[in-house]
Amino acid sequence: MKIERNKSVEQWAIEEIQNNWGNEAREGIHLTDLLTPRRKYWQVVKPLKASIKEISYWTSGSAIEAKILAAMGYAKGETKEWKGIKYSVDTFLGNIPAEIKTRRRALAEEGKEEEIYEHYLKQLLGYCAIENSTKAWLIVLSMLEYKDATHTEPEWAFYDVSFDENELEDERKRLIETKLLLEDALKNKNPDLLPYCPKWMCARTLKIMTKKPYCITCNKEFETEWGANKHISSKTGAGHEIMPAEYEIKVEKICKYYDDCKPVLD
């Protein structure tokens, strides 16, 4: 038997996928657009091909969702419209909106769900506001849940989510206001009044060590600041003079519209 990776066919297939992905572009403004209206603005004004990484994530997530819903005996929610905003809840468990999310990282620790699942919960809040439901289900599949030092395993988590009436009313107002802002921005070709996306969608700020910490006294270089601090805290290194590490700050762009949008990062 002989097996070889065929780079030329691979490249052709990837280009075909990218060229044909999204040809059936969805019309109108969707609820998910109002979670990140500035990104939606740039997608309309300056459409770019989806990366193969984006396509791979989207297709794997949607395939899991479809299979799981079918196995549970539930149908995919139909596309509806409310005040000119289109939306599609993943499904309804009984009459309760339910959203299925797949993660390539661990589940949230207990007590940190609101922080870790913030973006998921904002989407659910929008659905609940429109459907006038104070209850929701958030179903999360972690593909890489830590089990021990040698392996990870997929793990499901089902969360009861509840909102109060004030939260629903505030979200209905926000959806309408954001829709109007987005429509005005597209009409005037100016996104300045649109809120920025969450920073984790824009870029990562990396602190890169360019010069390692160095002990002048004993002419020794250390890989980390921790190592240098450990040295001067020891009997052999007590009183030694340390030249601290030097760093540069690098921005690693995540969003393809980063240069157009120019987000402000801390």
Regions inferred by a protein language model and the residue ranges of each:
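A structural signal for well-ordered alpha-helical scaffolds and beta->alpha junctions
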Residues: 61, 65, 120, 124, ...
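Residue-level detector of short, conserved catalytic/binding motifs and their immediate flanks
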Residues: 89, 125, 253
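Metal-dependent nuclease catalytic regions and adjoining charged, substrate-binding loops involved
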Residues: 114, 133-221, 225-230, 234-266
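Metal-dependent nuclease catalytic cores that hydrolyze phosphodiester bonds in DNA/RNA
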Residues: 1-97, 102-111, 118, 150, ...
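Metal-dependent nuclease catalytic cores in nucleic-acid-processing enzymes
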Residues: 66-72, 115-144
